[in-house]
Design a protein with these regions (language model features):
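Class I (Rossmann-like) S-adenosyl-L-methionine-dependent methyltransferase catalytic domain
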Residues: 8, 20-100, 106-155, 174, ...
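A short glycine-rich, Lys/Arg-flanked "PGG" loop and its adjoining helix->strand segment in the class I
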Residues: 178-190
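N-terminal accessory segments
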Residues: 1-20
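A short SAM/SAH-binding and catalytic strip from SAM-dependent methyltransferases
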Residues: 162-175
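A short acidic, Gly/Pro-enriched loop at the edge of an enzyme's catalytic core
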Residues: 153-163
Length: 296
């Protein structure tokens, strides 16, 4: 409340500059490094996690929306993503991992760990946000690629042995989710594996029983959960004016979705994919994790 009151006192022309300054201070490397070092003292980390965390980059872009000042949560998400991939690969590994796709890469929350976990792979970092993939190219050596709202027209120009798609299905409507799955089918190399995350029963319970809204108005969130309970899928656009559509010129098709495993499997089959892995709440104890390969 105090922050909102103070914001009204600041001239409108100054607000973007002051906001950028605040974000730069919050993401200052010295601050982030201290947060990482605190996490390194966690006795529950495995030796492998500690080794990755000890070497991972501290550089967080000030526009990284995944970092809101909590370095521990930020780095834990990356460590959990590596664990997800390791579990999938223990079940179904490509012949070799030479080409790796991170879509959406954002500003590298997971990618900074992937480049350490798979040092022999060539990475493609793809995102719709201007500057995000370029940051990943500069900091982590990835090939940058710009995404688009209409995924049916996206051609990345190569096939991939392993693809990670963290928390994108969580924001797409049914049609866009199917197009994303078809994109995987087009871009997977023989034996390649696509791994993605989605909101399922856990998030539905949080909305229905705990009043969580996931940045939707309460009635929209309730409608999403109700549709999910009836059909296995629920979706609603984010409301306007929250900044979510800055990179989506159509002004729609980006919000909150709930997808049951059965619904995902039907869509994947329609896209020509076969499931090889599923774990409820596998990523950060929050999002469900799926892995698919192209049907033979």
């Amino acid at each position: 409340m105090l922050r909102q009151q103070l914001r009204k006192l600041v001239p409108a022309a100054w607000r973007p500059h002051l906001g950028a300054l605040r974000r730069r201070l919050v993401a200052h490397p010295l601050r982030v490094r201290a947060q990482r070092r605190r996490l390194l003292r966690d006795p529950d980390l495995t030796a492998r996690q500690r080794e990755l965390l000890d070497r991972v980059s501290d550089r967080i872009h000030h526009r990284d929306g995944m970092y809101a000042g909590d370095g521990e949560s930020y780095f834990r998400a990356g460590l959990s993503a590596v664990e997800c991939l390791d579990e999938v690969l223990a079940r179904r590994a490509p012949p070799e991992i030479r080409r790796f796709l991170d879509l959406p890469c954002g500003y590298g929350r997971e990618l900074r760990f992937f480049v350490l976990r798979f040092p022999g792979a060539a990475f493609t970092a793809c995102d719709i946000q201007p500057g995000a993939a370029d940051f990943c190219a500069r900091e982590f050596g990835a090939r940058p690629a710009r995404s688009r709202p209409a995924l049916a027209g996206l051609d990345l120009g190569e096939e991939f042995d392993l693809a990670w798609c963290g928390s994108l299905v969580t924001h797409l409507d049914a049609d866009a989710t199917l197009e994303l799955l078809r994109l995987f089918a087009r871009h997977l190399a023989p034996g390649g594996v696509a791994v993605f995350t989605a909101y399922g029963d856990h998030v539905a319970r949080r909305i229905s029983e705990e009043g969580a809204t996931y940045d939707l108005p309460a009635d929209y969130a309730a409608a999403v959960a109700d549709s999910y309970a009836r059909t296995g899928h629920g979706y609603h656009d984010y409301p306007r004016g929250q900044g979510y559509f800055d990179f989506h010129p159509e002004g729609r098709g980006y919000g909150v979705s709930l997808t049951s495993p059965a619904w995902v499997r039907r869509q994947a089959a329609a896209a020509g994919l076969a499931e090889v892995y599923f774990r409820e709440r596998g990523w950060s104890n929050h999002e469900d994790v799926f892995a698919f390969v192209k049907r033979a």
